[in-house]
């Protein structure tokens, strides 16, 4: 059974809005299915905790709904290993062409609930794969679409090589 790692205290995983301000719970972006978008003007910061690092190879973002006004269009994803390190640019995106899909999910009683429209996209990370513990998704303000000062996100999936320390 899936459990959101940001809601399991012992995992050490944390999700926050980069500037501390936003609507909805930022941890929702790690849910298997998130029925609402989280909104922010700054971006999302994901910390895997002190025991894990990830060599990111691919990632998927999901946004709920069919209205693209607040969808991410121009943004970057960055990573770093430690709090004091500079952010490394992993990828930058402009005018993203999202794929519209229907996301089906099931209620507590096992009944299928009406499919929800969402937009998803998966990208690969090019170049040298370095280990990172913290990731952030940040809107590019210099190319922000007119009338969209905030951005929404319903889910993120990170793929790659996870490093777990040896506790011997």
Positions of PLM-derived features:
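A short beta-strand element within beta-rich, extracytoplasmic domains
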Residues: 53-66
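Solvent-exposed serine/threonine-rich low-complexity stretches and specific carbohydrate-binding patches
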Residues: 89-112
């Amino acid at each position: 059974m899936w459990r959101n790692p940001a809601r399991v205290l012992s995992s050490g995983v944390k999700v926050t809005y980069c500037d501390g301000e936003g609507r909805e719970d930022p941890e929702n972006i790690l849910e298997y299915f998130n029925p609402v978008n989280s909104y922010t003007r700054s971006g999302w910061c994901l910390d895997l905790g002190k025991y894990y690092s990830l060599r990111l190879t691919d990632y998927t973002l999901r946004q709920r709904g069919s209205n693209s006004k607040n969808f991410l269009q121009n943004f970057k994803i960055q990573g770093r290993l430690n709090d004091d390190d500079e952010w490394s640019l992993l990828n930058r995106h402009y005018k993203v062409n999202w794929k519209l899909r229907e996301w089906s999910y099931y209620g507590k009683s096992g009944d299928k609930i009406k499919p929800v429209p969402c937009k998803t996209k998966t990208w690969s990370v090019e170049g040298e794969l370095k280990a990172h513990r913290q990731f952030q998704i940040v809107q590019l303000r210099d190319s922000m679409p007119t009338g969209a000062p905030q951005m929404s996100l319903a889910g993120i999936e990170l793929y790659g090589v996870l490093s777990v320390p040896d506790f011997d």
